[in-house]
Amino acid sequence: MSDNPQEYELDWDVEKRLKLNDAGLVPAIVQADGTNEVLMMAWMDTHALAYTLATRRGTYFSRSRNEYWIKGLTSGNVQEVTGVALDCDGDTVLLTVKQTGGACHTGAHTCFDNDVLL
């Protein structure tokens, strides 16, 4: 099994349901297994989703770095993926994960804990 997400191809039955944006990406919402707390939002392409499904490791595409990002590979804050679902339109992916350490790149438990607006 390769550690290069780009070598993974998404099953056609899944891929034909996805509605990717013009950049070939789909938003991925990540929730904590057991509590359903929203931890983060990231982007995936078909290779990142295929790699995630094959390895159960949260894998995303960084738009700013233009590269794949396997959550926790450098930080140790890994995501064991326990569930993956598409929304009714196929334009958003929902991942359920067992999170080790912080989910946010800042090290915080969630990316949504700093600026509560309401």
Curated annotation (Swiss-Prot):
InterPro entries: PRA-CH, PRib_AMP_CycHydrolase_dom, PRib_AMP_CycHydrolase_sf. SUPFAM superfamilies: HisI-like. It catalyses: 1-(5-phospho-beta-D-ribosyl)-5'-AMP + H2O = 1-(5-phospho-beta-D-ribosyl)-5-[(5-phospho-beta-D-ribosylamino)methylideneamino]imidazole-4-carboxamide. Its main location: cytoplasm. It is found in: Cytoplasm. Pathway: Amino-acid biosynthesis; L-histidine biosynthesis; L-histidine from 5-phospho-alpha-D-ribose 1-diphosphate: step 3/9. Pfam families: PRA-CH. The keyword Hydrolase applies. Keywords: Amino-acid biosynthesis, Cytoplasm, Histidine biosynthesis, Hydrolase, Magnesium, Metal-binding, Zinc. Its cofactor is Mg(2+); Zn(2+). GO terms for biological process: L-histidine biosynthetic process. Its EC number is 3.5.4.19. Catalyzes the hydrolysis of the adenine ring of phosphoribosyl-AMP. This is Phosphoribosyl-AMP cyclohydrolase.
